[in-house]
Curated annotation (Swiss-Prot):
Keywords: ATP-binding, Ligase, Magnesium, Metal-binding, Nucleotide-binding, Ubl conjugation pathway. The gene is pafA. It comes from Thermomonospora curvata (strain ATCC 19995 / DSM 43183 / JCM 3096 / KCTC 9072 / NBRC 15933 / NCIMB 10081 / Henssen B9). The lineage of its organism: Bacteria, Bacillati, Actinomycetota, Actinomycetes, Streptosporangiales. InterPro entries: Pup_ligase (IPR022279), Pup_ligase/deamidase (IPR004347). This is Pup--protein ligase. It catalyses: ATP + [prokaryotic ubiquitin-like protein]-L-glutamate + [protein]-L-lysine = ADP + phosphate + N(6)-([prokaryotic ubiquitin-like protein]-gamma-L-glutamyl)-[protein]-L-lysine.
Length: 452
């Protein structure tokens, strides 16, 4: 697929703290957070003017789903816009708490595990053609996805019975099967529930739920960009080596616990390979593919970062990507802190630092401290992120949805929207079904808006 539709959904961890003690239950905090949303949207599940969806997910986790994007750079920008929107709700909720005499700070974390060991996710969505063999897609993707954490994990200090260890992925401990149609009970690598949110005869939506949430813009670019390249190769019929894993679930944990990328995992054919071996195989194929077919600036940037990350892991010279890959950035931050204060990895102060990296409050979060210092590379910029808070991508269906919502709100009309429907709740109940996510212009929608 030359042009692909991408979408990211991020669930956020939420807590309210007063002098180090939890003051409100996550449920109550979430209600405060969403009070402003409910006051104008009459619901805690709304679509916004930028085409995105914001809602309270299972277990009081605020979730932001980006609008449909057809470029990875746009996707990164819109994912960050979601962070800013939630940061705005946080500031608003803290103010309201103070007015009600409840002292405390609300924290929103863009991470994947809380201290109680609960996991919440970052889900990636890729539009793929309906004609292909979905089973083959999964077969080729799973070894790639299991080992991909070595290039785009968010990193985590894991407390184990044998002491603390630094893992490259947060999600890996919580994945229980390879391919499944459930997302919460047993967490699979690829979710097959067939809701394309598009013309079902032409498209399928590949729903990848194994990835970590990223703070780093460049890590996000690599995560989605490399996956897109792998999908393009599968779609083009590139012959891939059979790297089917004997036990993907055991492998995903083994890979996560090995920062060197050298630990061997068993393949179904009886051979063994390390996460580095497997990633190098996919990277090599992708590089040949782009060398032969040509690629845009984004594809070249993705390949460059992919190669450097693999080299950094292989040589142990993590400085090569310390400004670009989340788990490396965080690992070096923790190591510097430990050396300075002579702390063991199991220290609560290290756990605090680990968490603070994911704080989305720009005046408080450690990732944003690094960004202000110019210590991390970027893909987008603050102006584009600010714009994306209210302006949808202009080249996809999100433009139609965003425009419809904006006009209906300005005219104070009652409306209902989802990913494919735009409906005016008047006597005529006029509804437009937008089945093509690539279409940013539609005269039926223009007519609907004009008739408000």
């Amino acid at each position: 697929m030359e042009r692909r539709i991408f979408g990211l959904e991020n669930e956020y961890g939420v807590t309210c703290v007063f002098r180090g003690q939890r003051r409100l239950s996550p449920d109550e905090v979430a209600r405060y957070l969403f009070r402003r949303v409910v006051s104008w949207g009459r619901s805690s599940n709304v679509f916004l003017r930028n085409g995105a969806r914001l809602y309270l997910d299972v277990g009081s986790h605020p979730e932001y789903a980006t609008p449909e994007c057809d470029s990875v750079i746009d996707l990164v920008t819109h994912d960050k816009a979601g962070e800013r929107i939630l940061e705005g709700l946080l500031v608003d909720a803290e103010r309201r708490l103070r007015e009600e005499g409840i002292a405390g700070d609300i924290y929103l974390f863009k991470n994947n595990t809380d201290s109680a060991g609960n996991s919440y996710g970052c889900h990636e969505n890729y539009l793929v053609g309906r004609h292909g063999e979905f089973g083959r897609l999964a077969d080729v993707l799973i070894p790639y996805l299991v080992t991909r954490q070595i290039i785009c994990g968010a990193g985590k200090v894991l407390q184990t019975p044998r002491g603390a260890v630094y893992c490259v992925s947060q999600r890996a401990e919580h994945i229980w099967e390879g391919v499944s149609s459930a997302t919460t009970r047993s967490r699979p690598i690829i979710n097959t529930r067939d809701e394309p949110h598009a013309d079902a005869e032409r498209f399928r939506r590949l729903h990848v739920i194994v990835g970590d949430s990223n703070m780093s813009e460049t890590t996000m670019l690599l995560k989605v960009g490399a996956t897109d390249l792998v999908l393009r190769m599968i779609e083009a019929g590139v012959v891939m080596r059979d790297l089917t894993l004997e036990n993907p679930i055991r492998a995903i944990r083994e890979v996560s616990h090995d920062m060197t990328g050298r630990r061997k995992v068993r393949l179904a054919n009886g051979r063994e390979a390390s996460s580095l071996d497997i990633q190098k195989e996919y990277y090599g194929k992708a590089k040949d593919f782009i060398d032969r077919r040509g690629g845009d600036a984004v594809a070249h940037r993705v390949l460059d970062l992919w190669e450097r990350t693999l080299r950094a892991v292989e040589t142990g010279d993590l400085d090569l990507v310390a400004r670009e890959i989340d788990w490396v950035t965080k690992y070096q931050l923790i190591e510097r802190y430990r050396r300075k204060y002579d702390l063991p990895l199991s220290s609560p102060r290290v756990a605090q630092l680990d968490l603070a990296y994911h704080d989305v409050h720009r005046g408080r979060g450690l990732y944003y401290l690094l960004e202000r210092r110019g210590s991390v590379e970027r893909v987008t910029n603050d102006l584009r992120i600010f714009e994306a808070k209210s302006v949808p991508p202009q080249t996809t269906r999100a433009r139609l949805r965003g425009e419809f919502i904006r006009r209906a709100q300005e005219k104070r009309r009652d409306f209902t929207v989802d990913w494919v429907h735009l409906k005016l709740n008047d006597q005529a109940q006029r509804t437009v079904l937008c089945k093509d996510p690539f279409r940013a212009v539609d005269e039926r929608v223009d007519k609907l808006i004009a008739g408000m």
